[in-house]
Amino acid sequence: MGRDHGLIRTERLDRLALRQVDSGFRRTPEQRADAVRRLARLMELSGGIYFGDDAASQEQLCEASPEELRALLTTVRFRCTLRVYRFLREGLQRYPLSQMRLSKPLSGDRWRQPAKAPVVLKPIEGDAHPFPIEIDLPPWTVARDVDFRRWLFGYGADVVIESPQSVVDEVSSRAKQLTGLHASSH
């Protein structure tokens, strides 16, 4: 794996091969415990196992106070249909609750929200995608995490992404590319 001091990185197992043993690098028990602590924190903040490629950014997030963390994370905001909203509100384990904000249910919905669920956003009555959801994530997750992007984009037309603008632009570009591909193949 990489030689960047302090960088935590994961790789696909099918790409893993032992080429040579580097016996010159040994961590002390304290360094190992610190790396394990940072790994756990990065997994919590990222909602996955992709941690970007910059050790300094990782360290900054791991050591940030709650106030500093808010400024370092990127908010992804989207609105969704009832079908996706029901699915997401029942599966709140993917991202830390402290980094999520969900829509309140529409009037007449008999769903009993869990006590700790961050249900604070106001739904948009009469809209096809009335349920806003916000998730605060590290910038590298939003920009390059394949699993996060597959999760978000996988809902297709059941989700309208509102921010950040870079993700809105990417969805628009992908839609145009797909439309062009399918239109030209007929």
Regions found by a protein language model. Name each.
Residues 1-2, 151:
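Short, acidic/hydrophobic/Gly-rich beta-strand patch recurrent on exposed beta strands
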Residues 44-186:
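Polybasic (Lys/Arg-rich)
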